[in-house]
C-alpha cells in the first residue's frame, strides 16, 4: 500500500501544474490554480493563444506567452506579469507552470547572438544549427561573502579624461550619467570596441528600454568591427512590455555570471539604460496595485536596484565589470532613480550638456565625475598629484568665469591669466577622437596609455606647452599627436 501511495505521489509530482486565466488587465494576468498547487514567486508560466494567420491561407497559428508570478492572492490565485503582448489572450485559457524561473542559454553559444528576455535567439541565420547545452535561471543569489575578491585594480580604457580623473575599477560598477543626447550610448559603444581590441575579454550587452534603431545600429557596427563574435547581446527595447524591460538586465547578468564562474573569464557587462530598468519597475509596480513612493516610483526601488547590483561583483580571480548608462530626467540628479543608483557605483562619469555644446567629446564633466580609486594607494602618487593639479586649475578657471564676463580676461593678474589659458588647453585636451565616430569625423580613433596621459597633463600644468595655441589641443590623442598638430600649424601659418 505504501508503494502505491509513493507511486501516486510520484505521478502527481510528474504531472505539470495547470491553471486557468481568471482576469486580464493589460499585461497583468491573474491565474487560478488547484488548491495546494500554487507556483512559487518568480516562476515562469506559459499560456498558448490562438492567432489567425494570413487571410488567404486561413491557417491558425499558436503563440506562447511567458508570464512571471509576482504575487500570491487569496483563493489559490497568482498575479502574473506578461513578458509579451497579451493580444488574443482570453479568460479561461490554460496556463502551465514550468516549475522554476525563466531559464536562459549560457556559455559559448551566446557569443555572437542576440537574445530576448526569455533566451530566444533573434539573429539565427537560415540553416544555422545551434546546440544549447546548458540553461541557468535568471533569478540567482549574489556570491557568498567569502567568495568576493578584495583586490582593487584600475581598468585602463585608453580614454584620457576617464583614466586621469575618474579611473574605472576592474570588477567595479561604473555609471555614465547624463541627459538626453549628450553621448552615453556612444561612450558605451566605444568601450565595447576598446575592450574587444585591447583586452580580448568577453562582453555582454543589455539593451533596456532604448531605441530599436540604436540596437540595430549597434549590432551592425559590432559585426563590421569584428567584435560581435566575442559579445552576447540581450534586448528588451522601448516597444516591449514593462515586465520584459524589468528582466532584461537579469538575463544579461546571468550570461555574464556563467563566463565568470564557470569559464573563469573577466567579463564586461554593459547596460543601456539602467533608468529604463527603474522605469519598468515603476510601471510593473503600478500595474500590480502597489502604493507609489516618492515622485511616483515603486516603493521597493532600493530593493530592486540592490538585487541587480549586488550580483555584479568580482569573485576570487575573476570579475564582472559593469558600465551602466543612466539617463537623468530633466538633468535632475536628485531624482530618486539616479540617486538610488549612486550608492552602488565605484566610479561616476557625468556627461555635461555645456561641454557637449562646445564640441568637446566625450563630454565628461571633469569636476563632477568621481572615482573611489583616485587615491595614491591604488593609482600611485604621480597619478593622484596630476589629477589634483588638473582639477585645481579647472576649478580656479570656473571661479574666474564671472569676473571675466564682467571685466574681461585682460584685467586679470598674470597668474590668473596663465591659469585660464592652461585650463582652456586642458579642457580641449580632455576631448578625444573615438573609433566608433571615425566614419562621421574622418579622424582615426586613438588609444592613450594612462602613463602617457599623466605625463602629458603634468607637462601642461608645468607650463611646458604655454606657447602652443589652444587649437592644437582639440580632437587629438596623446603627446605625439599634439606635437604633430603643432608642427603642422606652424608650417601652415608660420612661426
Swiss-Prot record:
Main location: membrane
Catalytic activity entry: ATP + H2O + 4 H(+)(in) = ADP + phosphate + 5 H(+)(out)
Binding positions for ATP per the UniProt entry: 178-185
Parts of the chain that traverse the membrane: none
SMART domains per record: AAA (SM00382)
CDD domains reported in the protein's UniProt record: ATP-synt_F1_beta_C, ATP-synt_F1_beta_N, F1-ATPase_beta_CD
A single cellular component GO annotation: proton-transporting ATP synthase complex
Superkingdom of source: Bacteria
Subunit comment: F-type ATPases have 2 components, CF(1) - the catalytic core - and CF(0) - the membrane proton channel. CF(1) has five subunits: alpha(3), beta(3), gamma(1), delta(1), epsilon(1). CF(0) has three main subunits: a(1), b(2) and c(9-12). The alpha and beta chains form an alternating ring which encloses part of the gamma chain. CF(1) is attached to CF(0) by a central stalk formed by the gamma and epsilon chains, while a peripheral stalk is formed by the delta and b chains.
General function of this protein: Produces ATP from ADP in the presence of a proton gradient across the membrane. The catalytic sites are hosted primarily by the beta subunits.
Protein name: ATP synthase subunit beta
Organism, as annotated: Bifidobacterium animalis subsp. lactis (strain AD011)
Amino acid at each position: 500500500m505504501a508503494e502505491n501511495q509513493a507511486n501516486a505521489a510520484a505521478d502527481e509530482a510528474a504531472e505539470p501544474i495547470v491553471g486557468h486565466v481568471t482576469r486580464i488587465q493589460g499585461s497583468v494576468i491573474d491565474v487560478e490554480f488547484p488548491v495546494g498547487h500554487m507556483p512559487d514567486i518568480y516562476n515562469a508560466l506559459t499560456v498558448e493563444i490562438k492567432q489567425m494567420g494570413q487571410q488567404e491561407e486561413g491557417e491558425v497559428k499558436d503563440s506562447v506567452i511567458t508570464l512571471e508570478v509576482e504575487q500570491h492572492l487569496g483563493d489559490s490565485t497568482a498575479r502574473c506579469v506578461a513578458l509579451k503582448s497579451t493580444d488574443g489572450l482570453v479568460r479561461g485559457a490554460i496556463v502551465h507552470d514550468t516549475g522554476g524561473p525563466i531559464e536562459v542559454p549560457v556559455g559559448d553559444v551566446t557569443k555572437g547572438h542576440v537574445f530576448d528576455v526569455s533566451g530566444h535567439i533573434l539573429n539565427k541565420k537560415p540553416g544555422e544549427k545551434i546546440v544549447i547545452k546548458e540553461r541557468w535561471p535568471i533569478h540567482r543569489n549574489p556570491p557568498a561573502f567569502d567568495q568576493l575578491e578584495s583586490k582593487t585594480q584600475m581598468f585602463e580604457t585608453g580614454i584620457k579624461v576617464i583614466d586621469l580623473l575618474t579611473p574605472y575599477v576592474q570588477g567595479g560598477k561604473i555609471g555614465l550619467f547624463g541627459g538626453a543626447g549628450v553621448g552615453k550610448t556612444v561612450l558605451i559603444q566605444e568601450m565595447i570596441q576598446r575592450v574587444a581590441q585591447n583586452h580580448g575579454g568577453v562582453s555582454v550587452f543589455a539593451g533596456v528600454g532604448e531605441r530599436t534603431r540604436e540596437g540595430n545600429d549597434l549590432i551592425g557596427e559590432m559585426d563590421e568591427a569584428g567584435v560581435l563574435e566575442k559579445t552576447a547581446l540581450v534586448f528588451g527595447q522601448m516597444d516591449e512590455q514593462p515586465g520584459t524591460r524589468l528582466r532584461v538586465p537579469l538575463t544579461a547578468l546571468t550570461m555574464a555570471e556563467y563566463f565568470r564562474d564557470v569559464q573563469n573569464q573577466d567579463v564586461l557587462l554593459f547596460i543601456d539604460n539602467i533608468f529604463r530598468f527603474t522605469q519598468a519597475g515603476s510601471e510593473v509596480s503600478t500595474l500590480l496595485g502597489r502604493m507609489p513612493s516618492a515622485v511616483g516610483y515603486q516603493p521597493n526601488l532600493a530593493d530592486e536596484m540592490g538585487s541587480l547590483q549586488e550580483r555584479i561583483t568580482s569573485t576570487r580571480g575573476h570579475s564582472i565589470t559593469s558600465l551602466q548608462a543612466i539617463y537623468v530626467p530633466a538633468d535632475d540628479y536628485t531624482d530618486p532613480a539616479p540617486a538610488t543608483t549612486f550608492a552602488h557605483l565605484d566610479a561616476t562619469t557625468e556627461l555635461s550638456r555645456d561641454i557637449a555644446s562646445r564640441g568637446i567629446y566625450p563630454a565628461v564633466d571633469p569636476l563632477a565625475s568621481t572615482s573611489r580609486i583616485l587615491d595614491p594607494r591604488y593609482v600611485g602618487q604621480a597619478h593622484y598629484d596630476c589629477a589634483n593639479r588638473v582639477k585645481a586649475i579647472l576649478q580656479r578657471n570656473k571661479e574666474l568665469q564671472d569676473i571675466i564676463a564682467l571685466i574681461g580676461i585682460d584685467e586679470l593678474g598674470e597668474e590668473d591669466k596663465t591659469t585660464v589659458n592652461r585650463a582652456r588647453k586642458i579642457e580641449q585636451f580632455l576631448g578625444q577622437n573615438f573609433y566608433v565616430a571615425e566614419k562621421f569625423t574622418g579622424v582615426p580613433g586613438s588609444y592613450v596609455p594612462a602613463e602617457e596621459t599623466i605625463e602629458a597633463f603634468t607637462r601642461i600644468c608645468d607650463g611646458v606647452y604655454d606657447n602652443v595655441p589652444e587649437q592644437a589641443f582639440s580632437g587629438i590623442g596623446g603627446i605625439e599627436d599634439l606635437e604633430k598638430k603643432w608642427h603642422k600649424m606652424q608650417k601652415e601659418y608660420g612661426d
